[in-house]
Amino acid sequence: MQISLYQKNLADWTGSIIAVGLLEGQIQEQLSLLEEICDYDSLLTHVEEKDFSAKAGELIKLEILGKSLEKIILIGLGKPEALSIDDLREGAALASRASIGSKGKIGILFPWEPFNPISASKAVAEAMRLSIFKDLRFQSEPKPQNNPQSIDLIGLPESNHNIIKEVDPICSGVELARELVAAPPNELTPAALAEKAVEIAKKFKWNYKILNRKECEKEGMGAYLAVSQGSDLEPQFIHLTYKPNGQIKRRIAMVGKGLTFDSGGYNLKVGASQIEMMKYDMGGSAAVIGAARAIGELAPVDTEVHFIVAACENMVNGSAVHPGDIIKASNGTTIEINNTDAEGRLTLADALIYACKLEPDAIVDLATLTGACVIALGEEIAGLWVESDELANELKDASSACGEKLWRMPLQASYKEGLKSMLADIKNTGPRSGGSITAALFLKEFISNGIKWAHIDIAGTCWTDKDRGIDPAGATGFGVRTLVNWACKSNPDIEK
C-alpha cells in the first residue's frame, strides 16, 4: 500500500474514490469542498435520500457522481465538539474496508484542522493499512482480497512525508506480531519463535543469544524450566540486543511472555477457559518481537534495547510439574506452585531476573497474564502496573499517541498477603479476588532495587473475535506500537 500526502488543489486530484469524513451539523458545509470534482447537487440529494446524519460509525457509498470519480464514501465522525484522533482512526478503518476491491487511487478527506498534522497523518495511515490485514497462510486455496494500493491523504502538508515513511516499519511489526499470535501451536513452536527472532537479529546485524535447556539450567532458571518440563519441545530463551550508533543515554528491556501453547498443566484448562485458543498465550512475546522488527528499521537514537522472551509450552506428561511442587527461581526465591495454570508468571520471573542483570534503566513486560484483567478492563484496554510515575507517563504518552489504551492499576502492597506460603518464600497465585493485582505483585518480587519496571497485562487486548476499530478479527498485535513509540521517543520524527 502506497500512502502519500496531497496538498494541492482538490480540482487537480486524480483518483477513482474519495472518502470524506463528516461531522454532525456540518454536512452541507463540508461537502461543498467536493463541488469541483463531482455533481454537487446530485450528491446532496443522495445524502438526503439516505438520511445520512454523520453519526459516528455511519457510512454510505455513492456510485459514479460525475467527472473522474467512480465512488464517494461518506463516513460519520460524530459531534464536532467530541472529535478525537481516535475518531479519525475509526473513520479511516471504515474507509479502508469499504474500499476493498477497488482498483484506482483513493483519496481521504477528513477534518484535519483540530489536530497536529503529524499525529493525524500517522494515525490515519496506520489505520488504513492495519484495518485490512488478512492472514491467508493456512488456507489450501487462498483467495487474496483486492486491497487498495494507492491512497492520498488530501489536505495534509506534503512536508510531513517523512512521518509516512515510519508507518511501513511500524505496521510491518504489528503484522508480524499478528501472524505469530495467529499461527497454530503445531507451527509456532518455541524453536520456531526463536528462529523468527534470530532472523530479525541477523537482518539488522544485532547480537543475540538463544539459550537451550542446559544453558538455562546453568543460569538456575528453575521457575521457567519447571513450566517447560511437561513438554517434549525444548524451551528457547531468547535475547536480542539493539545498540545505536553514537552515545548511549538510555538502556531499556522489553520482556514478553512466550507460552506458545498453554494447556494449563495438571490444572487443566476446561470448559470456558478456551484451551483451543491458548496459542495466543505468547501474545506478549509477539509484541516484543514485532517491536524488534520495527525498531530495527527505525533505529532509536541514544537508546539501547534488549528484547527478552522465555519461550516454552505448558503441557501435561509424566514429567510435568505438580500442583504443590516447590521450585527455585534464578535469584534463589523458592516458589510453591499451587496452580500449574498460573505458569506465565513463573517463566517471567526468570526472564525478569535475567533482564535485571543487564542493569537497564527500565524494564517493561507484556503478558497475556490474567483473566481477572479481562474482567476488570474488557477487551479494548490493557492493564498497566508501575510504581514509577515517570515510567508510567512515558508509557501512557507512547500508548495514547498510537491509540493503544492502557489503564494504570494499583500495586496494592497489602494484597501480597495472599501470596504467602507456609513452606516456600511465595506462592504463585493468591485468592481469586484481585487476581490481576496479585499477579503483578508476584512479578515485582523478581525486580532488582533501583530498576524501574512496568507490567502490561494484554490478556483481553491481544485477540478480537470480530472487526474492532483498526483491528480485523483475529490477532491484534497490541503493544507493538506502544513499545516502538517508547523506544523511539528521542527520534526527531517519532510522534511524542
From Swiss-Prot:
Active-site residue numbers: 269, 345
- Per UniProt, Mn(2+) 2 binds at 257, 262, 281, 343
What keywords is this UniProt entry annotated with?
A: Aminopeptidase, Cytoplasm, Hydrolase, Manganese, Metal-binding, Protease
Cofactor binding notes: Binds 2 manganese ions per subunit.
Where is this chain primarily localised? cytoplasm
Q: What one GO molecular function would you report for this record?
A: manganese ion binding
Enzyme Commission numbers on file: 3.4.11.1, 3.4.11.10
Q: What class of enzyme is it?
A: hydrolase
The cross-references to InterPro entries, in alphabetical order and at most eight, read: Leucine_aapep/pepB, Macro_dom-like, Peptidase_M17_C, Peptidase_M17_leu_NH2_pept, Peptidase_M17_N
Biological processes annotated in GO: proteolysis
Q: Which reaction does it catalyse?
A: Release of an N-terminal amino acid, Xaa-|-Yaa-, in which Xaa is preferably Leu, but may be other amino acids including Pro although not Arg or Lys, and Yaa may be Pro. Amino acid amides and methyl esters are also readily hydrolyzed, but rates on arylamides are exceedingly low; Release of an N-terminal amino acid, preferentially leucine, but not glutamic or aspartic acids
Q: Which cofactor does it need?
A: Mn(2+)
Indicate which residues the UniProt annotation says bind Mn(2+) 1. Answer: 262, 341, 343
Subcellular location(s) per record: Cytoplasm
Its family remark reads: Belongs to the peptidase M17 family.
**What is the role of the protein in this entry?**
Presumably involved in the processing and regular turnover of intracellular proteins. Catalyzes the removal of unsubstituted N-terminal amino acids from various peptides.
Entry protein name = Probable cytosol aminopeptidase
